[in-house]
From Swiss-Prot:
F-type ATPases have 2 components, CF(1) - the catalytic core - and CF(0) - the membrane proton channel. CF(1) has five subunits: alpha(3), beta(3), gamma(1), delta(1), epsilon(1). CF(0) has three main subunits: a, b and c. It is found in: Mitochondrion; Mitochondrion inner membrane. One of its GO terms (molecular function) is proton-transporting ATP synthase activity, rotational mechanism. It comes from the Eukaryota. The keyword Nucleotide-binding applies. GO terms for biological process: proton motive force-driven mitochondrial ATP synthesis. It comes from Aspergillus terreus (strain NIH 2624 / FGSC A1156). SMART domains: AAA (SM00382). Belongs to the ATPase alpha/beta chains family. ATP synthase subunit beta; part of the gene cluster that mediates the biosynthesis of citreoviridin, an inhibitor of the of F1-ATPase beta-subunit. Mitochondrial membrane ATP synthase (F(1)F(0) ATP synthase or Complex V) produces ATP from ADP in the presence of a proton gradient across the membrane which is generated by electron transport complexes of the respiratory chain. Whereas ctvA to ctvD constitute the core biosynthetic gene cluster, ctvE acts as a self-resistance gene. This is ATP synthase subunit beta, mitochondrial.
Amino acid sequence: MFRLSSGLLKGGACASRSRIPQLGRSLYSTATSAGADKTQGKIHTVIGAVVDVQFNHGRLPPILNALETTNQGKKLVLEVAQHLGEHTVRCIAMDGTEGLVRGTAVADTGNPIMVPVGPATLGRIMNVTGDPIDERGPIEGVRLMPIHTEPPAYTEQSTHAEILVTGIKVVDLLAPYARGGKIGLFGGAGVGKTVFIQELINNIAKAHGGYSVFTGVGERTREGNDLYHEMQETGVIKLDGDSKVALVFGQMNEPPGARARVALTGLTIAEYFRDEGQDVLLFIDNIFRFTQAGSEVSALLGRIPSAVGYQPTLAVDMGAMQERITTTTKGSITSVQAVYVPADDLTDPAPATTFIHLDATTELSRGISELGIYPAVDPLGSKSRLMDPRIVGEEHYDTAMRVQRTLQEYKSLQDIIAILAGVA
């Protein structure tokens, strides 16, 4: 029986190796010398998801390094977030800390969180640390990559514009998607963002020649379960054959540290396939939960919040991830990101910060969904940088402009009718 919230399985991918400056873009070998020493420490304080670790001997582990300890017989990964004085680091736990006690031994891995990448991840479900949670045993024959890396150099990036056909007419006509671009699905609660992504998976991923990575960030376990079984039924995932999709989940009940990092785990897997010359589809549902988890972590670390309670590093955190989602001369990553809009307010800092990184935006309207029209795409609110006659062609561009003009006139007449009805 498939359970997203099952515990970490033994034999999950983790390896210690020497730290490489700047982390670079190269693929790393998992080999490590048998006698390599790990910096040892012990747990000093546990306050929810925040764990302080004391190192009385040796140097402190760098920021973003992964530390490992055991909690009730299971591996627990901690990520270094702050240095407190000369001997203590403050960490964020990637799993629950219930049962963790002071004095427990902690080892510095010498690396950021390392996750498995490569063909062996296809058809499997992993958590933020790359451990399988589909109860199908360990993921073997893989190499490991750090979830924190630098984006590709400008000279490696490609600017070629090509349309990605989705099969959804309102999108393909009025706000077409770019192959290798970043696409945002904006909408409030219950307007159909997840269903829209599932439709895109059905239309694109099944006919897509490359691989897909689906990352569930802070969403419902039930939706992940339904998606997994639906992919099995449609043949995207084959338990006894070649699958075309890898799934990474950090669901709603996970600690904020896991929800803040799980998107990077999925992105790291997608980057590997891209650098191997593949065209990759990366689905992230929901990017708002990434921001929300970041604000929780920021509050736990004692940082003063900025507007509406978000972390002061909101723009930096979002930019660091979005800049890695790009197309290079080797391959492409086409990213489709669902963006929850709190209270249907598009000026909220979280969706507003996401806007600036996107090539196309599809706005899902509550008013249209209330009419029973699905997908509830707002044809006037959705935009794309590809809507240019030099890219889509003169005929396509003129048709789209006429459609939008007609819809805008209809909307204006609706307002006039409402005013006259009120006067009468």
